[in-house]
């Protein structure tokens, strides 16, 4: 691609190099000019199909992801050393928002560590959202310029698929069929190539309709993502551990995923952990692997079993740990290695109120006395059996007897501190690790 008179060259390792146009021979400059003119016309057609001016004559992966996010009106979700993400739950939060002529439910844009666009993942009609009343608007099925509203999930999915296929075919011609994705999320997709990146439209019967935009080289590999070396991963994980003089130790830089209005804490938390461990993941596709029921909800056991092979193929492994009683000394070695622990617990209102208050008042006047009363109270309470939830334990403080927790509810819930007695009150006895 081109940017301000410079040619952007992409190397096999994914890095980019900018070279001034005048350094090229005349015949190369003529070729580049002709290529850019051709792509400029196609970019206009692609943007008209998309509905937003998000694409340019430059290669997708040489663009700053923030520019694409701004063009598509996607709010920033997370900034981390492994890359940033932007996410919009369009069907419930942005009335009238359409992509390729259809209303998406989730739009997620990911960057690499340098901030360049890596992939765009869009989920349209799907079984987890069809018929849901959990904050879901009726906009998805209100197309004033088309046939009658769909009366079933199958009709809704077919409608979205047909609208998207028509938009992309008008812009880029007929698509070609291809198998795409890793084990557990592998599906047949229609593929359109343009300017060294690919648009992949999939309809998985009874599950979902999705569009992904990725580098053509990634599509050529069937969507199978690469693997970061063990040495590089361990170095990155160790560098993510933060320590304070007060005894706080925690894993920093874990990508945030906002699970939105649905009961998708399991796939959202898995996406966070997988990306932290160098494994590509998409919350919505993981939800389908986890057998989300119509209207939302995921079976954690099914999800874990289906993800084992996917994680293993990336040189990682899932490990289950029975932990009827959480003890800081048992958590230390994992946190010290930069590995978060996925934690099954009951997210009770009292727990969250105390977590917020404790995090906001730590070290303040009267805090120690209040915390002592909390410890005494919850050490003798009976365990709750509702509000089942999956989040992360990402830190500890041995001096104060606290653990750091992180929930997939957005930035405010990225890091909270709770006394170990409160954590044990809501503990369900299971921890899960993704290990090198």
Language-model features and meaning:
Residues 1-56:
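Compositionally biased alpha-helical segments
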Residues 2-5, 16, 104, 115-117, ...:
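Extracytoplasmic
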Residues 35, 167-175, 271-280, 306-313, ...:
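Structured segments of extracytoplasmic/periplasmic soluble domains
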Residues 42-52, 58, 70-156, 160-162, ...:
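Amphipathic N-proximal alpha-helical interface segments
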Residues 46-61, 65-68, 77-79, 186-195, ...:
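Active-site-adjacent structural segments surrounding the nucleophilic cysteine of cysteine proteases
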Residues 210-249, 362, 368-390, 394-436:
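Noncatalytic regulatory segments and standalone regulatory/sensor domains
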Residues 264-266, 341-344, 392, 404-406:
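Structural recognition of the beta-strand scaffold that forms the well-ordered cores
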Residues 297-398:
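Predominantly the structural core of cysteine protease catalytic domains
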